[in-house]
């Protein structure tokens, strides 16, 4: 028989640096999950990613306090800021542009994000990422 799900916790944790301090500790502790076990497993799974990149993670906690987790790809905004070489997006994206991204960079980001996007094909995925770039105040070339 399948285990009963007790809770689903969604967090955004820096790759390779999960530790028991907030936000991880309190979120898992209130559901009785072994926090260190999660931290070790998460850090091992995100070793290949860029250290410090924010990684969304969905943790499924079962009634017997065991858990499974699924890591997603880093947010598009993080990848776009890295590609454009900026610290943050524009406060006024329609009037004040803060950087530029090329079509090739958008395609690279779309390839990275492909597992998490619901786009029908790669062109639609690139358009989705381009829309995110424009909303952040980035010029899109190409």
Swiss-Prot record:
UniProt xrefs under SMART domains = RL11
User: Quick check: keyword RNA-binding in the entry?
Assistant: yes
* Gene3D superfamilies for the chain: Ribosomal protein L11, C-terminal domain, Ribosomal protein L11/L12, N-terminal domain
Checking SUPFAM superfamilies in the record gives:
Ribosomal L11/L12e N-terminal domain, Ribosomal protein L11, C-terminal domain
Organism domain of life: Bacteria
Does the keyword RNA-binding feature in the UniProt annotation?
A: yes
Entry PTM: One or more lysine residues are methylated.
Q: List the GO cellular component terms.
A: cytosolic large ribosomal subunit
One GO MF term? structural constituent of ribosome
* A matching Pfam family: Ribosomal_L11
Keyword terms, alphabetized: Methylation, Ribonucleoprotein, Ribosomal protein, RNA-binding, rRNA-binding
Q: Which GO terms describe its biological process?
A: translation
- Family listed: Belongs to the universal ribosomal protein uL11 family.
What the protein does comes down to: Forms part of the ribosomal stalk which helps the ribosome interact with GTP-bound translation factors.
Cite the PANTHER family for this sequence: 60S RIBOSOMAL PROTEIN L12, LARGE RIBOSOMAL SUBUNIT PROTEIN UL11M
Cite the record's note on assembly: Part of the ribosomal stalk of the 50S ribosomal subunit. Interacts with L10 and the large rRNA to form the base of the stalk. L10 forms an elongated spine to which L12 dimers bind in a sequential fashion forming a multimeric L10(L12)X complex.
The protein's name is: Large ribosomal subunit protein uL11
